Amino acid sequence: MFTVQALVSRSFATVIVAAWLTQPASAAEVPCLILPYVEVSVVSPTEGLIETVAVERGDVVKKGQVLVMLEASREKAQQAVARAKAEQEAAIKTSRVKQAFAARKVARATDLLKTSSIAQHELDEAETEKALAETSLLEATENKRLAELDLQRANAELALRTVKSPINGVVVDRLQHPGELAKRDPPILKLAQIDPLRVEIFAPLSMLNQITVGQQAEVRPSDQPGGVYAAKVTIVNRVVDSASGTFGVRLEIPNHDLKLPGGLQCTVKFNGAKK
């Protein structure tokens, strides 16, 4: 279970707007902030004692990777019982034998009745036994189906004791440890997806019709590791913030080698028309 924070916080927006206001009017570059694409708080979908936490802060994780395992002895035992019941065939086999025997008995009784070798009530009894055998087989089949569904439920409950990563990313923080009771607050781990990174800016109103989705840009981090990074506009907010006279723009930077961290201040220069 996870919660995703995908919007720039008000404090970040304040930093960006303040930086823009200090730029000269002729400045070609707009202040920006490099952030993780998404940030995820990993919580357990069910309460339980934490048995293992497989990652540490700073570790790179893959989507679907096991992060946390809760103590699950009861769930494993329930799964074993459910599997044993679901795999039982004896009741169905017995019912099939009884049904086949009853069918043969009815056939014999029918032939004997034609020659008046038995009374009608004996045929009736044979047909009743056949009907009961068919009902018994149906009941055994339904019970097996219920056992299979119970096994599915047991498997699902056991699966809830394993928490997997919802994203490709890095571990930002580890807040709970083995021996503690897993609960929603605090989360067990915090993850961040940093490939791609998102770049948030608040551009001046004069640029509203100059920036388009798909447009290319160059992003320069203000701090280490420095350099220039190619980015592409993915969102242009069409609602203007009247207080600051700005509008929001989001870009994405590929970060396959994960060398560029999130949280850096930067400047962005747009490369003209949409490509």
Put a short name on every predicted segment.
Residues 33, 51-54, 60-66, 157, ...:
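Surface-exposed patches in structured soluble domains
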Residues 194, 213-230, 258:
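Low-complexity, intrinsically disordered
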Residues 173, 227-275:
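Structural microfeature recognizing short secondary-structure transition sites
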Residues 1-13:
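Bacterial N-terminal signal peptides that target proteins for export
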Residues 28-45, 149-166, 191, 234-240:
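Short beta-strand-turn/beta-hairpin segments enriched in glycine/proline and small hydrophobics
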Residues 16-49, 230, 234-235, 262, ...:
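N-terminal beta-strand block that forms a small beta-sandwich/beta-barrel module immediately after a flexible targeting
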Residues 25-29, 164-166, 221-230:
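Short coil-to-beta-strand transition motifs
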Residues 62-167, 175-178:
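Amphipathic alpha-helical coiled-coil/rod segments that serve as protein-protein coupling scaffolds
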